[in-house]
């Protein structure tokens, strides 16, 4: 079970869909996009609040310009991220043509964490970099976590602009409520003239043309604030430059440079990570 990720069955018909099993919950565009197709090697800082994969049941309905999803969930197959909750997402695509698309979305959810505890952390958009970790530590007395997310995606020829805001409001007993949040904005450019692709409310494998090769450069700024009241997890703003070299549909070489401007409990953290 430790290696299982997406394990689900789904029925679809006339725009309606029902899915049962373990799947990515309908919140946070960067999470819903496969890591094979994301602009950067790691997700933006707001991913600290993402629900990721949970076991549950989802109903969805899609039209040419709208997509609605509603999901009820609990823990996952790894026995982590325990807590029952529900989340909904509404996506509007006023226009959606290959190489010319606008995606706007709103999501909201509520969760009752198992054992009334919660924890949020981040490794500054480069996995394995422990020394720059932001971490709230274990928060006790958490009755409920309410998440809210905003998404925007614009594809215009070789350019892709994407941004999200994600917020977590914690209702706590005897410790005071807390509001934590983060956002990012990023821009990608296919120097080779190719363009990003989109399907079912998320990014798909780029349109790489006949030879299947492409070069893309990208920039991102993102922020995360895990400080509010008695919660002192730190805050940071990151600046990232990236390059992707596609050698076909299944091979991508990527490099990212991240400058971190962070602080946690009075200690400044400003590393450069490659």
Where on the chain are the PLM-derived regions?
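Outer membrane beta-barrel
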Residues: 1-114, 180-210, 216-229, 234
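Outer-membrane beta-barrel pore domains
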Residues: 117-274
């Amino acid at each position: 079970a430790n290696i299982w990720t997406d394990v689900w069955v789904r029925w679809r018909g006339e725009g309606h869909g029902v899915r049962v099993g373990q799947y990515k919950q309908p919140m946070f565009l960067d999470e819903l996009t496969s890591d094979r197709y994301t602009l950067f090697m790691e997700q933006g800082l707001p991913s600290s609040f993402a629900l990721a994969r949970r076991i549950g049941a989802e109903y969805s309905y899609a039209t040419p310009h709208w997509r609605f999803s509603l999901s009820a969930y609990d823990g996952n197959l790894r026995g982590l991220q325990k807590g029952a909750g529900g989340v909904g997402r509404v996506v509007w695509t006023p226009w959606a043509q290959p190489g010319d698309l606008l995606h706007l979305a709103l999501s909201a959810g509520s969760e009752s964490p198992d054992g009334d505890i919660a924890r949020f952390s981040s490794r500054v958009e480069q996995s394995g970099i422990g020394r720059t970790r932001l971490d709230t530590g274990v928060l006790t007395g958490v009755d409920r976590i309410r998440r809210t997310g905003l998404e925007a995606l614009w594809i215009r020829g070789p350019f892709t602009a994407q941004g999200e805001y994600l917020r977590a409001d914690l209702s706590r007993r005897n410790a005071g409520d807390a509001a934590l949040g983060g956002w990012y904005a990023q821009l990608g450019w296919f120097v080779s003239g190719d363009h990003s692709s989109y399907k079912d409310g998320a990014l798909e494998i780029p349109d790489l043309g006949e030879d299947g090769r492409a070069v893309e450069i990208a920039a991102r700024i993102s922020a995360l604030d895990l400080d509010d009241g008695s919660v002192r997890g730190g805050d940071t703003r990151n600046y990232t430059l990236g390059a992707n070299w596609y050698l076909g549909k299944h091979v991508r070489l990527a490099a990212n440079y991240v400058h971190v401007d962070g602080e946690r409990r009075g200690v400044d953290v400003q590393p450069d990570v490659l």
